[in-house]
Amino acid sequence: MIRISDAAQAHFAKLLANQEEGTQIRVFVINPGTPNAECGVSYCPPDAVEATDTALKFDLLTAYVDELSAPYLEDAEIDFVTDQLGSQLTLKAPNAKMRKVADDAPLMERVEYMLQSQINPQLAGHGGRVSLMEITEDGYAILQFGGGCNGCSMVDVTLKEGIEKQLLNEFPELKGVRDLTEHQRGEHSYY
């Protein structure tokens, strides 16, 4: 479910040494499955452990996950990274905003999941997003851009060189992608 690197475990163990005996960590998601989902880590004293929690035992600590957060923390990674600027704890949870779909789920669900978990986070850096409107009978994913992507002069490159390549690589049953957006250049446009 969650991978915690050795460096992160050592960091947590150091912090836990200063807490009440038996205190561990809790990993959670607030607003799971929504665009506003946020992940966090907190101390979990022994009296805060719930019967429905999942206990994930690691070499140096135990991480508790509540029942509601568990499916959204699938494939999550916690690391403690040190570089020239200092050190920081990172928590990557690709499924926090949308629950991972099964490999045998309908194509529409699998494409939507990839858009939300992999492509939209990249577009968000420019204030943009893309939505799946439909998949045609002849195998084309019909997309609609919004935010900074609407009217952006680079949208064709983003569509063909970025999104289409990723989708066709992941879903060979697709023939291509088409843009349904009526692009209107404005102050919201990124380029």
From Swiss-Prot:
Entry-linked InterPro entries: Fe/S_biogenesis_protein_NfuA (IPR017726), FeS_biogenesis (IPR000361), FSCA_dom_sf (IPR034904), HesB-like_dom_sf (IPR035903), NIF_FeS_clus_asmbl_NifU_C (IPR001075)
One BP annotation, GO: cellular response to iron ion starvation
Sites where the protein binds [4Fe-4S] cluster: C149, C152
Outcome of mutating C149S: Loss of activity in vivo. Still able to bind a Fe/S cluster in vitro
Effect of disrupting the coding gene: Cells express the stationary phase-specific competition-defective (SPCD) phenotype and are unable to catabolize dsDNA.
Domain of life, per lineage: Bacteria
A GO term for molecular function: 4 iron, 4 sulfur cluster binding
Keywords, comma-separated and alphabetical: 4Fe-4S, Iron, Iron-sulfur, Metal-binding, Stress response
Induction and repression of expression: Up-regulated under conditions of iron depletion or oxidative stress, via IscR. Is also induced by heat shock or the presence of misfolded proteins.
Co-factor note (free text): Binds 1 [4Fe-4S] cluster per subunit. The cluster is presumably bound at the interface of two monomers.
Biological role stated in the UniProt entry: Involved in iron-sulfur cluster biogenesis under severe conditions such as iron starvation or oxidative stress. Binds a 4Fe-4S cluster, can transfer this cluster to apoproteins, and thereby intervenes in the maturation of Fe/S proteins. Could also act as a scaffold/chaperone for damaged Fe/S proteins. Required for E.coli to sustain oxidative stress and iron starvation. Also necessary for the use of extracellular DNA as the sole source of carbon and energy.
NCBIfam families: PRK11190.1, YhgI_GntY
Protein name per the record: Fe/S biogenesis protein NfuA
Gene source species: Escherichia coli (strain K12)
Lineage, top ranks: Bacteria, Pseudomonadati, Pseudomonadota, Gammaproteobacteria, Enterobacterales
